[in-house]
């Protein structure tokens, strides 16, 4: 019989989240819930939410990087909603991806 003193921590591992397995910051479970709730399809593959979470994370990182560049040009310290709104205008691909987004509550001139 093995004593519990020799076996500390052996059976206490916690489940690894899908976001952790894919090394993502965005929650795969929340993306999956949104896809199911939106009824975009009858059935959903296991890797579809993981892929979409990775795409969203990449897009957000790209926009924040461009917003940081806009912020450095205008010389404030904090990234503001205006900087995030103006950032995609410098890149054609990101502009096309974000062109249909509604900036709710943001009222500023370009």
From Swiss-Prot:
Gene giving rise to this polypeptide: gcH2A
Record protein name field: Histone H2A.1
Entries under Gene3D superfamilies matching the protein: Histone, subunit A
Task of the protein: Core component of nucleosome. Nucleosomes wrap and compact DNA into chromatin, limiting DNA accessibility to the cellular machineries which require DNA as a template. Histones thereby play a central role in transcription regulation, DNA repair, DNA replication and chromosomal stability. DNA accessibility is regulated via a complex set of post-translational modifications of histones, also called histone code, and nucleosome remodeling.
This protein's GO CC annotations: nucleosome; nucleus
Expression across tissues: Expressed in the generative cell within the bicellular pollen. Not detected in other reproductive or vegetative tissues.
Molecular function in Gene Ontology: DNA binding; protein heterodimerization activity; structural constituent of chromatin
Species annotation: Lilium longiflorum
Family: Belongs to the histone H2A family.
């Amino acid at each position: 019989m093995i004593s519990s003193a020799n076996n500390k921590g052996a059976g206490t591992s916690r489940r690894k989240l899908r976001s952790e397995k894919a090394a993502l910051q965005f929650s795969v479970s929340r993306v999956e819930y949104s896809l199911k709730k939106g009824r975009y399809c009858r059935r959903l593959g296991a890797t579809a939410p993981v892929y979409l979470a990775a795409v969203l994370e990449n897009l957000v990182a790209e926009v924040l990087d461009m917003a940081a560049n806009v912020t450095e040009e205008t010389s404030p310290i904090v990234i503001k909603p205006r900087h995030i709104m103006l950032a995609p205008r410098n890149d054609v691909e990101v502009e096309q991806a974000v062109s249909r987004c509604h900036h709710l509550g943001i009222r500023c001139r370009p």
